[in-house]
Structures are given as structure tokens and as C-alpha cells.
Amino acid sequence: MKDPFALFGMEPRPWINSELLREAFSERAAACHPDSNPESDAADRFLELNEAYQTLKDPVTRLRCLVELSGTIPQQEQKEITSVPQELIALFAEIAPIKAGLGNFLNQRSAAKSPLSLALLRHEEQKVKTEIAIMEKRLLCEWESSQNLLHTLDEHWLELSPALINSANELATKMRFLQKWIASLKLDSLPSTHPSPL
């Protein structure tokens, strides 16, 4: 794969300054955007630049990229050696019934046709929202802890030991699951049972 860090003149590391990355992208994107650049390969270069930016701004894809660039773990073997950490399995066991409860509530709500049936669901709505809020708080704490680990990895990255590369791979796996779970439990995606005023 091409080194996305090199496209922005950055050293390959687990942590990068998001503001500096954004500025570097804006500067380079303006120079190679097809609308302002007549060169025949401008569109391809802009697409490549955008893909590199998307890779680097997300800590999960950035870590995956670093693991691949290190050459320590061949790309085709990454999926085989990446197992789900035990702590995530335990956490998922707690998330699963909450998501099931949310799904059940949404089904009941969509089937409710009258203001009375909606009103009868308000207690269940509050219960589901409370459970989601508690779990969301835990997941955000786990995400913050993962960000701290990202900084720790960055401090030792130049060592490039196999153990360090493996830690990066495991952290990417954990953060990917956290991203997915946090997105799936967003409270603002839960419709209210309060009927709309006539």
C-alpha cells in the first residue's frame, strides 16, 4: 500500500495532531483538485489524497495502516491473528440485551397507533433510555482510555518491536468495536413516544 503519512509529509505514528492533518489536507487538496488543476491525473491524485486523509483521521484505520506499513504482520494474516479481547466479549454480553430491549421497544412503538398506546410505552421508553445512557457513558470512558493507550503507543513507537505492533493491532480492534457500539446506541436516534400535537 502507499504510505498515506508520506502524502502529508508526516512521520508514521499512532497519534497525530488532527488540526495539522486537516490543514495539510486542505493545502494539498486545493493544489490538486480537478476543478482548479488542469493536469490529467489531478482527479486520481485528489482521490488518493482524500483516501489517505480518511485513513489518517480515524485512529482505527490509522493503526491498521501502521501495522501494515511495519511489515511485521503480513496484510493477509492480520485478520487471522486479530482476536476479540476478552474484556470486549464481556462488555458485549452486557450490550446485547440493551440492544435487544431497544429493538423490542422500537417494534412496540411502531405498532402503536393511538395516543393511549403511545402513552403506555412511556415507562418502557424511559427505562430503555436510562440503560442506553449508562452504557453509552461506559463506552465513552472506554474510548477515552483507548485514546490514552494511543498516546502511550505513540511515545514508544520508534522502538517498532513485535509486541508494540501487536498492541497496535489489538488497540485498533478494540477501538473499532467501541466505535460501532457507541454509534448503535446513540440516544438521539431513539424516537419519542410522546404524540405530536395536532
Residue ranges, per PLM feature:
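C-terminal accessory/regulatory regions appended to core domains
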Residues: 1-198
